[in-house]
């Protein structure tokens, strides 16, 4: 069992990190979050935090806007999501699916299917932060989700990234 901070990262963050490998090429209002995602992934690669995501993220990270995706984008998604060196994938299970359903039944948290699975996965494995830029489901329900012990935040709002990684967040390449 690890005592390292556990962070859940939503698929939209991986897509942006691959799309804007140079954070300065992103829209101005997204650059800080992209730099933080890059640092969170580097912190995970160095073992300072544990980054989790649902195995569903593999299916969601199909491209960064271009069709078909470039070989480099495919390589990045594979190396980050399935190498086991940066991100710890969590397989869906009946327990996670029931927890996703119960978000609505027991907690009045209304989320679409994939968002419910993501939040339930983060709760099931004990993550303290759920990082997303998706302003719809999880962010709209952030207060209710926080009552379950999970903060829904943008990457730049993380409190779990070690300070030495925060200082290194200048234009880094996606791992």
Question: Positions of the model-derived regions?
Answer:
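Acidic, PIN/NYN-like endoribonuclease modules and their adjacent C-terminal/linker elements
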Residues: 1-6, 21-31, 43, 123-175
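Short, well-structured N-terminal submotif of metal-dependent ribonuclease cores
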Residues: 1-53, 66-75, 170-175
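Conserved glycosyltransferase catalytic-site signature
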Residues: 11, 55, 112-119
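Anionic, Ser/Thr-rich low-complexity intrinsically disordered regions
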Residues: 13-16, 40, 53, 57, ...
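Short, flexible loop segments at the rims of nucleotide/cofactor-binding pockets, characterized by
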Residues: 27-30, 106-111
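Short active-site oxyanion
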Residues: 47-51, 85-88, 126-129
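Acidic catalytic patch
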Residues: 56, 82-107
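Short, hydrophobic alpha-helix immediately C-terminal to the catalytic nucleophile
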Residues: 59-62, 119-123
């Amino acid at each position: 069992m690890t005592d390292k901070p556990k962070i859940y990262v939503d698929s939209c963050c991986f897509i942006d990190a691959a799309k804007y490998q140079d954070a300065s090429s992103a829209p101005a209002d997204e650059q800080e979050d992209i730099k933080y995602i890059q640092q969170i992934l580097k912190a995970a690669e160095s073992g300072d935090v544990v980054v989790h995501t649902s195995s569903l993220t593999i299916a969601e990270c199909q491209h960064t806007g271009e069709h078909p995706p470039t070989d480099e984008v495919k390589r990045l998604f594979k190396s980050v999501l399935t190498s086991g060196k940066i991100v710890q994938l969590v397989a869906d299970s009946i327990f996670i699916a029931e927890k996703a359903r119960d978000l609505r039944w027991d907690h009045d948290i209304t989320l679409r299917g994939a968002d419910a699975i993501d939040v339930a996965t983060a709760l099931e494995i004990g993550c303290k932060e759920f990082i997303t830029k998706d302003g719809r489901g999880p962010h709209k329900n952030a207060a209710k989700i926080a009552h379950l012990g999970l903060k829904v935040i943008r990457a730049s709002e993380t409190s779990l990234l070690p300070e030495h990684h925060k200082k290194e967040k200048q234009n880094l390449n996606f791992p």
